[in-house]
From Swiss-Prot:
Alphabetically ordered keywords of this record: Cytoplasm, Methyltransferase, rRNA processing, S-adenosyl-L-methionine, Transferase
Role this protein plays: Specifically methylates the pseudouridine at position 1915 (m3Psi1915) in 23S rRNA.
Pfam family, one: SPOUT_MTase
Protein name per UniProt: Ribosomal RNA large subunit methyltransferase H
Family recorded in the similarity comment: Belongs to the RNA methyltransferase RlmH family.
Disulfide bonds: none
Organism for this UniProt entry: Pseudomonas putida (strain W619)
Length: 155
């Protein structure tokens, strides 16, 4: 099974990269977790933010192959408990398609990305810093896998 986090933003601090890689490497070989970074467009005082979001969305969608699943991470998505995420992870595994978890930039996701989503997931009603979201997703995917495999990490 292949999971990809497609996230707007690059050049994260070292602690973010280390946190992400720590959880990604804990997963078994048959569950790969990859990170695809989309460069954040420069936002100036007079920037056309709608155009920038649209461009970022196009760049995100260009990384998705036909038939792959898109799951957006957004504040208005559905909150999942760890057990619910484990159930989704198991469904995705049985479906055998690549799953693309999409995280937008500071202003969120392009409408075109949201329109392609098969599922919408909310990590929290709180506004979370994007660097932390990467680590949180990695940890939660790892935790969901431990639930499915009976590993004691989740207890």
């Amino acid at each position: 099974m292949r999971l990809r986090l497609i996230a707007v933003g690059s050049r994260m601090p070292k602690w973010v990269e280390e946190g992400w890689h720590e959880y990604a490497k804990r997963l078994p070989q048959e569950l790969s977790l990859e990170l695809v970074e989309i460069p954040l467009n420069t936002r100036g005082k007079n920037a056309d933010v709608a155009r920038l979001i649209r461009q970022e969305g196009e760049a995100m969608l260009s990384k998705v192959q036909p038939g792959e699943r898109i799951v957006t991470l957004e504040v208005h998505g559905k909150p999942w408990s760890t057990e619910q995420l484990a159930t989704e992870l198991d469904r995705w595994r049985l479906d055998s398609r690549t799953v693309n978890l999409m995280v937008g930039g500071p202003e969120g996701l392009a409408p075109e990305v949201c329109a392609r989503a098969e599922q919408r997931w909310s990590l929290s009603p709180l506004t979370l810093p994007h660097p932390l979201v990467r680590i949180l997703i990695g940890e939660q995917i790892y935790r969901a896998w431990t639930v499915l495999s009976g590993h004691p990490y989740h207890k």
